[in-house]
From Swiss-Prot:
Subunit description: Monomer. Interacts with TFEB. AMPK-mediated phosphorylated form at Ser-659 interacts with KPNA1; this interaction results in nuclear translocation of ACSS2. Interacts with the 'Thr-172' phosphorylated form of PRKAA2. Interacts with CREBBP.
Assigned EC number: 6.2.1.1, 6.2.1.17
Superkingdom of origin organism: Eukaryota
Protein name: Acetyl-coenzyme A synthetase, cytoplasmic
Gene responsible for this protein: Acss2
Organism per entry: Mus musculus
Amino acid sequence: MGLPEERRKSGSGSRAREETGAEGRVRGWSPPPEVRRSAHVPSLQRYRELHRRSVEEPREFWGNIAKEFYWKTACPGPFLQYNFDVTKGKIFTEWMKGATTNICYNVLDRNVHEKKLGDKVAFYWEGNEPGETTKITYRELLVQVCQFSNVLRKQGIQKGDRVAIYMPMILELVVAMLACARLGALHSIVFAGFSAESLCERILDSSCCLLITTDAFYRGEKLVNLKELADESLEKCREKGFPVRCCIVVKHLGRAELGMNDSPSQSPPVKRPCPDVQICWNEGVDLWWHELMQQAGDECEPEWCDAEDPLFILYTSGSTGKPKGVVHTIGGYMLYVATTFKYVFDFHPEDVFWCTADIGWITGHSYVTYGPLANGATSVLFEGIPTYPDEGRLWSIVDKYKVTKFYTAPTAIRMLMKFGDDPVTKHSRASLQVLGTVGEPINPEAWLWYHRVVGSQRCPIVDTFWQTETGGHMLTPLPGATPMKPGSASFPFFGVAPAILNESGEELEGEAEGYLVFKQPWPGIMRTVYGNHTRFETTYFKKFPGYYVTGDGCRRDQDGYYWITGRIDDMLNVSGHLLSTAEVESALVEHEAVAEAAVVGHPHPVKGECLYCFVTLCDGHTFSPTLTEELKKQIREKIGPIATPDYIQNAPGLPKTRSGKIMRRVLRKIAQNDHDLGDTSTVADPSVINHLFSHRCLTTQ
């Protein structure tokens, strides 16, 4: 794992102490004393006490935390009821059912009126261009959310309605999602990097009656005409018999055209004017955000909702190719993201927190919006990318806002490693106290660089494992309590009871490797797949009745640390984003030249994993560079740029079993030029394998 090398670099001056086992091997870094002194959980013993109580007495543990929030009416019945066993009936989880609350009221109104945080900065907004900056206080955010809630009400949005949001990382995105929550409407946020086809699919799946979007935005040097994509998506919806009745548009790149009194927020005009962006306007459907906000009152009574009412739908890739609408509910999600944020990042009131994730992903929902706001935190909201205008952008922002807690993805760390230490070390970073990673397992080399260069060997790293489906962190170190092992997500968070199962469903004790499952519910667990509870039960509970099945492999070492080994199902993790092989394959075979396709993951030095595609062509078609580019373009349009393959190989035949099943295990070996194929006795035509090896793409790893 590179630990001895890191030990040499540490020297006697390192404040992150190393622990050495009986055999002299490095076992991990202890939290620095200065972190422990002020930590909410200052020792491993204290963590173990709290974790044991949270698992053995979940109702009492979470009941005490629930007292920190406002409930319009108390829970009238059992605090927790659930069934994880498909053989005993319907799968369900209910926390505090019958209690009523509103998450927007808890994260805004209470912070302003009860906790007197009205003048505290909620977000520092940093635009794509350096110098495009603004800030918004809790009081200002509450006013804007109330105004936009009134806008939505005037458009007929009611409790239970679904609202699609397709926006870049601007303040209006936070305002829009909180306004939905205030009304009891479900927001369905679609990442602004997704295609018009993907947006259409998500609008149709949950029957969204309104779309909120933006004129356009820059991502680094690239101009994204988001309104054009939104229009294309709404046209596709109309063609399929579902006209969306209203589209509200934020004038973001065109903000400079607005008078000072017209601007709905404090966002400044963008520094790079964009006269070339042509916005098509659909009368009767399109409405300008700023015009609606001018007419809206700044007070809006929240809708009081059951703790088990849905809060939002967020789509994640499914192994069948059709995205799953993950449903999270109000009460349990609120408790869980607030608690994980407080303890995992060891949050204190003076902190400035920065999670670099886009709000279009679950990390952004939980740790850009809801978790920080529930704790009254000040956060950074960043529109740009880590390498624009230079490779030191992140660290200049850290210094600018004196960021104390920083949370990013391993893929970003690996990308920045390529540019060396200088872009990092020329900035102070003295404010940093805790670093975090999310999205995929971090390889030890990247962990060591992050620790040594970014954190100057004085910042604990919280390597967090969780999923869209879990709502918040599941396995994670705690900054003041957990000795860190590079690459390990370490131990379960409060309320989380992990187990490792073998193929027969038997729990493995001690050192073991197998399927990672969870034995009991935590408040943040998803409740269903929108409109398809059977799929929810089949995906997460059918394989091993009585357990929530993550779909990830896991290893537990002799010290009890958990190490995520990767997806067990046909899913790919590209730059921290989960992609379905079936979804990519479907996009490929829609091309007239492609008869059959198979997609596997391939190691990538920056993305972690990239797509390697095998395509079998229809008669009369020839494989060529032009066709390769056409296929890549088709995938970008159908799914989004994140799914663009790195490699596409011509495959006259695919290795299949005699029953016709494609042997993806063999294809993964071919992609990596690994001739150790294991048992191939079930391959119907072994000659196919030799041909694919001899014609494989030249890969970089």
